Amino acid sequence: MANHQLPMRTGVGIIVLNNNNQVFVGKRKDNPGDKWQMPQGGVDKGEDFITAMKRELIEETSIKNIKILKEIQNMYQYELPNNLVGIIWKGKFRGQRQKWFITKFLGKDDEINLDTQNPEFIDWKWINPQDLPDVIVDFKKELYLNLLKEINQVID
């Protein structure tokens, strides 16, 4: 099946802001470069977006103590580069179409734990939102530029 005929995976993404309006990013364990991303993941069958968002956030970061500031109305998507199609998601999808949420972290940093059942991140940090496009893999850069506009509407 040609790449363009593969469906998009339905997912969620989570923008987690701390009290200084910095954004949580994690360093993926399967990417050896110095690339960081915000938590994201797939929506399970029968699951709504908010439930999926909360589940993914706990699965990846152990973060439970959040307040939803905004459910972004637009669905954003990205396509995988050709060298990753067929490898990621067992070759079933060509990219991901995501519902994003902007949240406020109400807890303390020591509540963040990456040593979860199926760890995806090996490190994490808080960064300034304007640095997001510089830390993400190239094929998600346009997505992160759009998300930066959404973040700026909330924190300005």
What do the PLM-derived regions correspond to, one by one?
Residues Q37-M38:
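A short gly/proline-enriched turn/hairpin at secondary-structure junctions
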